[in-house]
């Protein structure tokens, strides 16, 4: 089964406040060169890729809420064989078991997705229009509903579900521990996996917070084997959410419309 790394986006960047003080006059000023990241040496025995994947999944399951920013690039292959790349940025906020908010960003104002455990709504601020429908009782079921029935895709869905290791590890034909590398200044385990239809790589933070930091997927089932790459940044694993963050209240004069791309219901 092909891995579904669905796109769209949500999350809120974290701001850090850095304090500083003037050095004593009888001492030299501190260097302005930032310290290099502390990177532990390569392990004597390479970890098993599936074990690292399970550590990530266990940690994500332990979080009752989080936010993340996803920047995704999808490769498109034209009939002329020219390759184009479409970018998407999403900020995602999740509160388990059944709350979701996604802000899809673009130059025209983007879109906003709300899921409050009962209904979901998609709002386009520029046009001041929205559509709403009944949702499933859990986040996993709602993500599947959005993708399969309404054709609303979120980025990196497979790492947002309750059991990401089970979904990601389906139909594996090989797994490789590539090594350790810095991703955005963060030491990460680089893992590579293959299935009959998809080759995919994942970079997982090394340390007490095994968070996914980067994903690359190569779709071998499509001629030309296009790729999708996603960077997951600005993780906040203990955010404070406003009480109304996940509830959609239509703005004044907003027009309610139907989901024009709704797929036929399964019989």
For the regions a language model picked out, list residue spans one by one.
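C-terminal motif of bacterial Sec signal peptides marking the signal peptidase cleavage site
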Residues: 18-19
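Gly/Pro-enriched, hydrophobic low-complexity segments
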Residues: 71, 121, 168-263
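Bacterial N-terminal signal peptides that target proteins for export
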Residues: 1-8
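N-terminal mature ectodomain segment of secretory-pathway/periplasmic proteins
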Residues: 37, 41-129
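An acidic-aromatic
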Residues: 22-23, 93-155, 221-228
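Bacterial Sec signal peptide processing site at the extreme N-terminus
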Residues: 22-38
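Flexible, processing/modification-adjacent segments and terminal tails
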Residues: 44-52, 123-187, 193, 249-252, ...
